[in-house]
Curated annotation (Swiss-Prot):
Side of membrane Mitochondrial matrix, spans: 1-43
Annotated protein name in UniProt: Mitochondrial import inner membrane translocase subunit TIM54
A UniProt-annotated Pfam family: Tim54
One cellular component term from this protein's GO annotations in UniProt: membrane
Mitochondrial intermembrane side: 61-458
GO process annotations (BP): protein transport
Gene name of the encoded protein: TIM54
Similarity field: Belongs to the TIM54 family.
Lineage of the organism: Eukaryota, Fungi, Dikarya, Basidiomycota, Agaricomycotina
Superkingdom, natural source: Eukaryota
InterPro entries per record: Mt_import_IM_translocase_Tim54
């Protein structure tokens, strides 16, 4: 038989008073009207505190970035509205940007993107153009600058032909173009770029005026290393007898009106030696563009991850630095560059080179060793085919192509250009190598300064 004993009665709901009693007739549940807020648990408090703090830090940082950028763009827009020299056919001011490779980074354009993100917007607003040469390897800035200065010196001495000026509207004569180039300025991104730039100046002005091309120099070095020389058994020369000697007859001489083409070409005289006094650099040195030193540090690797996170929430520091650098290039005065600037500017940034960067010579040597071991069999196969000692394989017949010695030589030259260029460039930019400096450069090299109001107002 079922137990019909009544159980414990539920407590009566709390009585609603005040405005709650009026809201009860609107259909709002009784529990909602009696709900009392309480603090969440400790874990939820920690979660919401961290989330809101990080969100506000991100919002504040990006708001400051937007404010700084807008303020500087409005400040320099007036320069972009000024009439261009030469009218509609004139050219705007054009600066050269040297953005060298960061050690250990596979991306060669990292410094270039830094310039385009943090400095370029203000130059565009001010109507200033820029040129960003390609620098795929360590030392590319040095080699390009060396070649440009060498060409300039050879043309000034009459050792190289000069371009014929065109008498067309809007085309500047060489003297005016050089003057505007000096007035435009040069942007150097990071300490590695500064080291390469100064070394390029030294080589260009101190290494003589002999004709020079880096690719040709490397090619000549590789030509005599014996990698592609074949090892063949010596063949004894045949002994000529009276019966074997055949005298040429008149009938054997080709009778043709083009017989002169078979004659050996006359030996052309070698280039005359350049007098020793022409190798001496001019004194004083020709004017050179002022430098804008743009700091740049690139964090790489797992160990530097905390600094990457800090940079993410402190983007305004980079925006402010880029804005100040742009104002220095647009409005700032110039001062003489001193030895201390070359030796100590951004010296701390070199401490951020990771293990991959510092092991670059060992990695290049390992790649070179493995490559030369791998091409030995390829050279033997190519030489055997060219000598007629083997036929085409099935794969070669399907591809309708046989690898020849010339193909391997061209491939090897490309790799050696990259290896030798990287090795030479790393010797210039590695932290143990001091920046190049000459006492005679005092007063010749100049750097842009940030305007005083921009140092405190941004």
């Amino acid at each position: 038989m079922a137990d019909l004993t009544p159980g414990a009665r539920k407590p009566a709901p709390a009585e609603l008073t005040g405005f709650r009693s009026a809201l009860a007739h609107t259909g709002i549940p009784h529990g909602v009207l009696l709900w009392k807020p309480r603090l969440p648990s400790r874990n939820w408090l920690v979660f919401w505190s961290v989330s809101l703090s990080l969100s506000y830090a991100y919002y504040y940082d990006r708001a400051e970035c937007k404010r700084i950028k807008q303020e500087v763009v409005e400040r320099v827009e007036k320069y972009g509205r000024e009439p261009m020299p030469g009218g509609s056919l004139g050219e705007p001011r054009r600066v050269v940007v040297w953005a060298g490779r960061w050690g250990g980074d596979d991306d060669a354009d990292r410094a270039g993107r830094y310039f385009r993100k943090y400095v370029k917007p203000y130059l565009v607003a001010a109507g200033i153009d820029y040129t960003l040469p390609s620098v795929p390897l360590h030392g590319s800035i040095t080699r390009q600058l060396h070649a440009a200065i060498l060409l300039q010196r050879r043309q000034a001495l009459g050792l190289a032909p000069t371009a014929t000026p065109l008498s067309l509207p809007g085309v500047l004569d060489p003297a005016e173009a050089k003057r505007r180039e000096v007035e435009s300025g040069v942007v150097v991104v990071g300490r590695a770029s500064l080291k390469e730039y100064l070394e390029g100046l030294r080589r260009g002005w101190e290494c003589g005026v002999d004709e020079w091309a880096w690719e040709t120099e490397v090619e000549k070095t590789l030509a005599g290393d014996g990698v592609f020389e074949s090892v063949e058994s010596p063949v004894e020369p045949a002994v000529e007898t009276a019966e074997t000697v055949v005298e040429p007859t008149a009938d054997a001489v080709p009778k043709s009106n083009f017989g002169f083409l078979a004659r050996p070409a006359p030996v052309t005289p070698g280039a005359p030696a350049i007098p020793a006094h022409l190798h001496t650099p001019p004194s004083p040195l020709p004017p050179t563009p002022p430098l804008l030193l743009l700091p740049f540090t690139n964090h790489l690797g797992f160990l530097q991850l905390p600094y990457m996170i800090l940079d993410f929430f402190n983007e305004r520091a980079k925006v402010r630095q880029g804005a100040q650098s742009a104002l220095a290039l647009i409005e700032g005065p110039t001062r003489d560059m001193h030895r201390e600037d070359a030796e100590h500017w951004e010296e701390k940034s070199e401490s951020w080179y990771n293990k991959t960067a510092r092991q670059l010579p060992e990695r290049l040597q390992k790649s070179r060793t493995e490559y030369y071991e791998a091409i030995k069999s390829r050279i033997d196969l190519a030489r055997a085919y060219e000598n007629g000692d083997r036929e085409m394989t099935e794969e070669e017949k399907k591809a309708n192509k046989v690898e020849r010695i010339q193909d391997i030589q061209a491939e090897r030259l490309k790799k050696e250009l990259r290896w030798k260029g990287s090795e030479e460039g790393w010797e210039i930019v590695k932290p143990e190598t001091p920046a190049t400096w000459r006492d005679r450069w005092e007063g010749w090299l100049k750097v842009y300064q940030v305007p005083e109001d921009a140092q405190k107002g941004l």
